[in-house]
């Protein structure tokens, strides 16, 4: 017998939060959390319909950030601190999209992990 799917209740959140942007070489992921670290909304380039090499473009980054920010804004979030991780192409576009969606960006922090000569990097590409 088929079960009835229930829509998850959306709970109003505090007006402050944190935006975690992970911009890798292949994809971009945006997660918006409250002050305690509980996820309020999230989005990725693949979730928004981008496939393959189009996932790592500034445009995909902009659309992804807007989608996550819009959902958080509707739940009551207004002020955010931004944490950026990774070397991806759309880092700046993601921050501009957050501001365009109505969230006030209070601080921007780059938390990209840098090795102190750790693992050997992959071989150079020959195109």
From Swiss-Prot:
Gene Ontology MF terms in the entry: rRNA binding; structural constituent of ribosome
GO cellular component: ribonucleoprotein complex; ribosome
Keywords: Ribonucleoprotein, Ribosomal protein, RNA-binding, rRNA-binding
Coiled coil region boundaries: none
InterPro entries associated with the record: Ribosomal_uS11, Ribosomal_uS11_bac-type, Ribosomal_uS11_CS, Ribosomal_uS11_sf
Function noted in UniProt: Located on the platform of the 30S subunit, it bridges several disparate RNA helices of the 16S rRNA. Forms part of the Shine-Dalgarno cleft in the 70S ribosome.
Family listed: Belongs to the universal ribosomal protein uS11 family.
The protein's name in its UniProt record: Small ribosomal subunit protein uS11
Lineage: Bacteria, Pseudomonadati, Chlorobiota, Chlorobiia, Chlorobiales
Gene this chain is encoded by: rpsK
